[in-house]
């Protein structure tokens, strides 16, 4: 991996973590073409932490409000003042995030099953997952607009969104896209659905990183901390720009374009993957691999 590769991966992670197009799927496809191997895990963790920082910066007032409500809730429980029915938006959203996140706990025991699709030698599965994401986006665009805000969310809403987040562990299924779609299906307003989706990503990203970073550091792969630092900064900076873009697209009601994008990308991945399986060749971008593939081919011919 070189500096160009880590910058490209940082840009991809920063954009696709928040745009409803699947960051894991894009990184899996990019790593497939760039022929990145053993250091993929630690790189993925660092890039995800970069986007985590972007969420904290972009939604700090709401996140801080939820943190305060967490401690106030504990106080109310011990003083007998807690009421499930009478909660403000931050407190109710805090509980809904906890419920949705709790659904990931048993699923993470099977994390190797999900990550195995990123480490295989083809991108056909990612292609079908991209198409699944496109279907969700098209369906959510056609559903009746809801009027339910954060203070009106129910446990059933959190369960439905949490279940969709579990499905999004597959590379190619957009976490933000699928959870936003689930929120819209539950009758949430677009702003509430998107805000909840982004904040819900915090414990998911943080928990996944904590579980994976131990395994990554135990590996014998030599790490370039300068490159990883660059990737972290790039993913955080691009992530902030992506969040601003999503907010703008939300106002303009243009999420449908991501459905077309993921559908086309999915078909392309399936086509390329099928070609690679049929021919035994792997298509890679030579300028990203320092022309190693062409040099090897030329050497064999001479």
Where are these regions (language model features)?
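Multi-pass membrane proteins that catalyze or facilitate reactions on polyprenyl-/lipid-phosphate substrates
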Residues: 1-302
């Amino acid at each position: 991996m070189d500096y160009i590769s880590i910058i490209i991966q940082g840009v991809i992670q920063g954009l696709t973590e928040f745009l409803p197009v699947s960051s894991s799927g894009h990184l899996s496809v990019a790593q497939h073409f760039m022929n990145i191997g053993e250091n993929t895990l630690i790189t993925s963790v660092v890039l995800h932490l970069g986007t985590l920082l972007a969420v904290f910066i972009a939604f700090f007032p709401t996140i801080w409000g939820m943190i305060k409500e967490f401690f106030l809730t504990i106080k109310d429980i011990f003083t007998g003042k807690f009421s499930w029915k009478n909660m403000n938006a931050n407190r109710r959203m805090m509980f809904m995030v906890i419920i949705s996140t709790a659904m990931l706990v048993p699923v993470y025991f099977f994390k190797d099953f999900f990550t195995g699709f990123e480490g295989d030698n083809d991108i056909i599965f990612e292609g079908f997952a991209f198409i699944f994401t496109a279907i969700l986006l098209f369906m959510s665009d056609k559903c009746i607009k809801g009027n339910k805000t954060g203070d009106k969310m129910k446990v059933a809403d959190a369960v439905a969104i949490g279940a969709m987040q579990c499905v999004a562990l597959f590379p190619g299924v957009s976490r933000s896209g699928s959870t936003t779609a689930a929120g819209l299906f539950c009758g949430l307003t677009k702003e509430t659905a998107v805000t909840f989706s982004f904040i819900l990503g915090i414990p998911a990203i943080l928990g996944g990183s904590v579980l994976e970073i131990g395994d990554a550091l135990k590996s014998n792969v030599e790490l370039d901390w300068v490159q990883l630092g660059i990737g972290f900064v790039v993913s955080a900076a691009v992530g902030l720009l992506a969040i601003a873009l999503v907010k703008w697209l939300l106002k303009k009601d243009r999420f449908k374009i991501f459905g077309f994008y993921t559908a086309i990308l999915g078909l392309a991945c399936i086509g390329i993957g099928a070609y690679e399986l049929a021919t035994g060749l792997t298509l890679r971008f030579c300028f990203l691999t320092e022309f190693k593939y062409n040099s090897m081919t030329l050497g064999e011919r001479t």
